[in-house]
Amino acid sequence: MITLISFSSLGLGFLGPVYAIFVVRNFSASLFHAGILSAVFLLTSAIFKMPAGKLVDKYGKWKILFIGLIGCGLSSLSYIFAFDIIHLYAIEFIYGISFAFQRPALLALMAVVSNKPSRGMLLGIFDSVDDISGAFAAVVSGAVVSSLGFDMLFFICFFCYFISGLFILKTREKIN
């Protein structure tokens, strides 16, 4: 479980600290545009989390989580092919939907693997691992972009989501 949480958190965490720089530098956009793009991601995610939660109940947490991770990975990779700011709006919308699928499924999975006497502790560990992964990603993302460029960072994000997807395929039978 920790591996799944870590790699999926890294996938998104690598983008956060440098995303505005990517938008401004590569699209001659303003920081205002970067803020709007982030808002598109967050609002889309917020709107689609409840329907995604219903899909988790109907089709199962593993399938929906896998779909969300694949969507997040492909969204990360698609930044490489964006050449107009309108492409970024489309990517943020799709990324938001994908993240919306991922999060309720992951939370449902956490509820299943935790037992009642230690549920709070396990959820605390989950949140701590999520935050630690994000902190690590914040430091590493700047170094990666400075030395290897944005494209490499997007490949790394994709790879993190890909590893999470493989983890799901490997462990879904063990935890249910």
Task: For the regions a language model picked out, list residue spans one by one.
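Intracellular juxtamembrane helix-capping segments at the cytosolic ends
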Residues: 101-114
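Helix-to-loop junctions at the C-terminal end of transmembrane segments
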Residues: 48-60, 145
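Residue-level signature of mid-helix packing/kink "hotspots" within the transmembrane helices
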Residues: 42-50, 134-135
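Loop-to-transmembrane helix entry/capping segments in MFS-fold secondary transporters
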Residues: 31-32, 116-126
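A membrane-interface helix-boundary motif in multi-pass transporters
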Residues: 146-160
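Helix-loop boundary and gating motifs at the non-cytosolic
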Residues: 1-42
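Helix-loop junctions at membrane interfaces in 12-TM secondary transporters
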Residues: 80-91
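Structural signature of the two symmetry-related core transmembrane helices
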Residues: 63-77, 158
